[in-house]
Amino acid sequence: MALLDLGLESTAVPRIRVFDQQRAEAAIRELLYAIGEDPDREGLADTPARVARACRELFSGLYTDPQTVLNTMFDEEHNELVIVKEIPMYSTCEHHLVSFHGVAHIGYLPGADGRVTGLSKIARLVDLYAKRPQVQERLTSQIADALVSKLDPRGVIIVVEAEHLCMAMRGVRKPGAITTTSAVRGQFKTDAASRAEALGLILRK
């Protein structure tokens, strides 16, 4: 089933599949004009191309199918908790197009078939959703729902901790403030003991 059908992808804007380098360069050039700069001066002459290439990388998650990331399964008959902690994460706030960064902690209880996915695939899934214009709450839920969709686990728990530079560099200007979001699915939502065990392991330093 497609992730659009599961509500894991936004339908508000048609998803483009090819990055438009030329259009991005023109937009950055116009932005430089708008702030009163000369995009043709020595220090800025190549900036539109550089920023466009950076955007292609920073937003590469828009052009990757999440279904292809969790494509490696192992029949390990494992039925206990799997946790990957402290996954470094860099994303871009969709409100100001400024970075937010931190760590993601991913835990899941394999389904009845005992199948698990590769640990690197979990990190790649975090990267895929982080490399989009995002809000932290949606990012957290998208990771959880993608794992549910692909792995059919008994439970999923996600905790994301991040500093938002839109709070540190501008506006309220509170550097060091950390936002924590979580998403729980399945057994972790219905069983308080399972949820407490997972959170204890995730938050233990």
Curated annotation (Swiss-Prot):
BP term (GO), one: tetrahydrofolate biosynthetic process
UniProt entry tagged with the keyword Hydrolase: yes
Keyword Nucleotide-binding: yes
Record Gene3D superfamilies: 1.10.286.10, 3.30.1130.10
Cellular component terms per the entry's GO annotation: cytoplasm
Binding site for Zn(2+): C93, H96, C166
Molecular-function GO term, any one: zinc ion binding
Catalysis: reaction(s): GTP + H2O = 7,8-dihydroneopterin 3'-triphosphate + formate + H(+)
Pathway as given in its UniProt record: Cofactor biosynthesis; 7,8-dihydroneopterin triphosphate biosynthesis; 7,8-dihydroneopterin triphosphate from GTP: step 1/1
Top-level taxon: Bacteria
Keywords, ordered alphabetically: GTP-binding, Hydrolase, Metal-binding, Nucleotide-binding, One-carbon metabolism, Zinc
The protein's Enzyme Commission number: 3.5.4.16
Family (UniProt): Belongs to the GTP cyclohydrolase I family.
Subunit structure: Toroid-shaped homodecamer, composed of two pentamers of five dimers.
Protein name in UniProt: GTP cyclohydrolase 1
Organism: Mycobacterium leprae (strain TN)
Lineage, highest ranks first: Bacteria, Bacillati, Actinomycetota, Actinomycetes, Mycobacteriales
Gene that specifies this protein: folE
